[in-house]
């Protein structure tokens, strides 16, 4: 499945939450902690190829996700995403490690999810700052929604959380 998304930096989470409410977005998943583990082989070939293999733990479950490389053909992030629920991440992580993979990056964030009309918006609080991650049906729809929230194309953040947090940690 193709994922189409973009991030925007958020200065004030209360203001952006109010704007989303005024636009009719409702909270579908309340604020919760997510733990993310990005896996790679020992040579870093997944990162070099621009792909991601991630295990995510949330209070409602665990998922294994593959993300393909980000397309350069758009200002927004287009990439293949394949995801499945897993029962026991604590068993799966050592299985990957025994198969030649290692945890390349580990990070946590608090996330609140809002939805409406084919959009999924995540308000993410990370150690690198707060971001609004907008997934939607098309570039035009996402850009239009961004404008309603007070953002423009110059505010697009195409970097991944792993990149943003890595920069903050090395910084």
For each predicted feature, which ranges?
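Short phosphate-engaging motifs
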Residues: 12-16, 130, 141
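A contiguous pocket-lining binding segment that forms or flanks enzyme active sites
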Residues: 123-125
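Short, surface-exposed beta-strand-loop junctions and turns on beta-sheet-rich folds
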Residues: 70-73, 129, 140-141
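Internal alpha/beta scaffold segment
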Residues: 145-149
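N-terminal strand-loop-strand beta-hairpin
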Residues: 1-119, 151-171
């Amino acid at each position: 499945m193709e994922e189409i998304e973009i991030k925007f930096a958020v200065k004030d989470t209360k203001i952006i939450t109010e704007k989303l409410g005024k636009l009719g977005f409702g909270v579908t998943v309340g604020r919760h902690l997510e733990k993310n583990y990005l896996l790679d082989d020992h040579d870093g070939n997944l990162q070099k190829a621009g792909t991601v293999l991630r295990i995510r733990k949330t209070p409602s479950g665990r998922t294994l996700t593959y993300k393909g490389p980000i397309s350069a053909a758009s200002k927004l992030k287009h990439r293949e995403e394949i995801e499945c629920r897993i029962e026991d991440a604590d068993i799966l992580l050592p299985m990957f490690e025994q198969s030649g993979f290692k945890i390349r990056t580990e990070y946590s964030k608090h996330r609140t999810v809002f939805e409406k009309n084919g959009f999924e918006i995540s308000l993410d609080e990370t150690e690198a700052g707060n971001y609004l991650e907008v997934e939607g049906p098309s570039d035009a729809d996402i850009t239009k929604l961004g404008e309603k929230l007070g953002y423009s194309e110059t505010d697009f953040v195409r970097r991944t959380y792993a990149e943003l947090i890595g920069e903050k940690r090395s910084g």
